[in-house]
């Protein structure tokens, strides 16, 4: 039976019921709905709606129901209930009779669903924080295992300057750290309970909403009933964090897809995260990474859809808000899956150290070192930049790397160049000079790795 049937003289059209019902997706809020109902029953005792004995019977029935839901959440989908709130109430009435009908006193589905969704977001957020840290740990472990590997750094997908594989991996650790921080901030902002705000104007019962909020694990209660039942900022904000983090993961995926190509050959992906072709037997496709890259659009699209659903909505609750769940559930599920898949990709990732070194030595990636050498000889940087550009053009013509040019060849472009230029053009020298904070000097990268290992160990502990 619908929770709102008394006002209507005829039943809903079956097509409308199918269109309107939300149980097929909001069943995922079952545990949170029961958790909120347990706390609400206690609050009703304090205002004299329920006796302690009645609350005890309801509590016992809800504990049994919670255990059943945890064991088999999909059982809920066998019901024709309108939504998860209707289903939980029907189960309680079946268990304790008319006593179950008293539980909704002073409560609306508007504040109820807002509470359920926030509780779900809190739990899912903690799970996602763990997945972010796990991926960071995977990146740090891979960086440590391949610390000696040098590879070319790119700008505009052109070889630019040598970096190390560890420095590359730590760049993504930094991105994920910002994702972690943003998620923590979002969880702090949603840590207020709307339960007790009723449909929109508050409840007529003197509920201690602060105590009620704390009982459910919130930091406190919301302050304005109109805002409380219509607020979906936390949904948009979590989707935004997911979208930005997925954008980071897409960059990670694209880098490794490129590094894994036959043309680059910098890394080899494990068979466990690749697939083959139904036609071409030689193929080993980076499907895990391509799916991460592709699913980014799905998550970003969900955020845009939610923003448009909320655009210009009048206060307070409107049925449009039912659109908050499917996109949110899918976005956070997808983000979680992609974080875990990215970590899996790293487990058996092989770095071709010789290939990466050869690539780092090619492409005139040491041209900046020659310019810095000229600056050290007293030539203004802009002039040095021009000299090196001309030198590179010549080196391309004679098909030599810079370090293989003879001294007379160098001196065609600047007489200040001496024999001491050659040590400056060596691969390790180019790394060693990057000593400012955040640079690729090996001692800096090692220190950054150690620091990351230490704070990740604290998280794991």
UniProtKB/Swiss-Prot annotation:
Organism whose genome encodes this protein: Aeromonas salmonicida (strain A449)
PROSITE patterns on file: FUMARATE_LYASES
NCBIfam families cross-referenced by the UniProt entry: argH, PRK12308.1
Annotated CDD domains: Argininosuccinate_lyase
Pfam family, one: Lyase_1
Primary site of residence: cytoplasm
The protein's Enzyme Commission number: 4.3.2.1
Record flagged with keyword Magnesium: no
Pathway: Amino-acid biosynthesis; L-arginine biosynthesis; L-arginine from L-ornithine and carbamoyl phosphate: step 3/3
Molecular function in Gene Ontology: argininosuccinate lyase activity
Listed GO biological process terms: arginine biosynthetic process via ornithine; L-arginine biosynthetic process
Domain of life: Bacteria
Subcellular location: Cytoplasm
Assigned keywords, A-Z: Amino-acid biosynthesis, Arginine biosynthesis, Cytoplasm, Lyase
Name by which UniProt lists this protein: Argininosuccinate lyase
Coiled coil (residue ranges): none
InterPro entries per UniProt: Arg_succ_lyase_C, Argininosuccinate_lyase, Fumarase/histidase_N, Fumarate_lyase_CS, Fumarate_lyase_fam, Fumarate_lyase_N, L-Aspartase-like
Family, as annotated: Belongs to the lyase 1 family. Argininosuccinate lyase subfamily.
GO CC, alphabetical: cytosol
Catalyzed reactions per annotation: 2-(N(omega)-L-arginino)succinate = fumarate + L-arginine
């Amino acid at each position: 039976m619908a929770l709102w049937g008394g006002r209507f003289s005829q039943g809903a059209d079956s097509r409308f019921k199918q269109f309107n019902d939300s149980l097929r997706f909001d069943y995922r809020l079952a545990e949170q709905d029961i958790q909120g109902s347990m706390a609400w029953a206690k609050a009703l005792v304090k205002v004299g709606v329920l006796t302690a004995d009645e609350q005890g019977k309801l509590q016992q029935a809800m504990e049994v129901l919670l255990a059943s839901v945890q064991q088999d959440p999909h059982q809920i989908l066998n019901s024709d209930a309108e939504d998860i709130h209707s289903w939980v109430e029907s189960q309680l009435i079946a268990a304790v009779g008319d006593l179950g009908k008293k539980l909704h006193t002073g409560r609306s589905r508007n504040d109820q669903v807002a509470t359920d969704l926030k509780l779900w977001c809190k739990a899912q957020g903690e799970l996602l924080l763990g997945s972010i840290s796990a991926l960071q740990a995977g990146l740090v472990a891979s960086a440590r295992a391949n610390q000696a590997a040098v590879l070319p750094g790119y700008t505009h997908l052109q070889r630019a300057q040598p970096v190390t594989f560890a420095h590359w991996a730590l760049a993504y650790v930094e991105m994920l750290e910002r994702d972690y921080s943003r998620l923590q901030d979002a969880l702090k902002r949603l840590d207020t309970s709307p339960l007790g705000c009723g449909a929109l104007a508050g409840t007529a019962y003197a509920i201690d909403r602060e105590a009620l909020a704390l009982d459910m694990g919130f930091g406190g209660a919301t302050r304005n009933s109109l805002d409380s039942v219509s607020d979906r900022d936390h949904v948009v904000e979590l989707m935004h964090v997911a979208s930005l983090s997925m954008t980071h993961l897409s960059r990670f995926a694209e880098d490794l897809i490129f590094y894994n190509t036959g043309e680059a050959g910098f890394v080899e992906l494990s068979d466990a995260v690749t697939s083959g072709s139904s036609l071409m037997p030689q193929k080993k496709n980076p499907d895990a990474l391509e799916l991460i890259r592709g699913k980014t659009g799905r998550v970003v699209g969900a955020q845009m859809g939610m923003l448009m659903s909320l655009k210009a909505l009048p206060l307070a609750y409107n049925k449009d808000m039912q659109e908050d769940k499917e996109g949110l559930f899918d976005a956070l599920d997808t983000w979680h899956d992609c974080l875990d898949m990215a970590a899996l990709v790293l487990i058996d990732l092989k770095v071709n150290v010789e290939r990466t070194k050869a690539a780092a030595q090619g492409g005139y990636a040491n041209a900046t070192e020659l310019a810095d050498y000229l600056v050290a000889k007293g030539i203004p940087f802009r002039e040095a930049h021009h000299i090196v550009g001309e030198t590179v053009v010549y080196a391309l013509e004679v098909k030599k790397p810079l370090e293989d040019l003879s001294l007379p060849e160098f001196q065609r472009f600047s007489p200040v160049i001496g024999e001491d230029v050659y040590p400056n053009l060596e691969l390790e020298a180019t790394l060693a000079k990057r000593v400012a904070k955040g640079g690729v000097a090996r001692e800096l990268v090692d220190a950054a790795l150690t620091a990351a290992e230490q704070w990740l160990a604290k998280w794991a502990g």
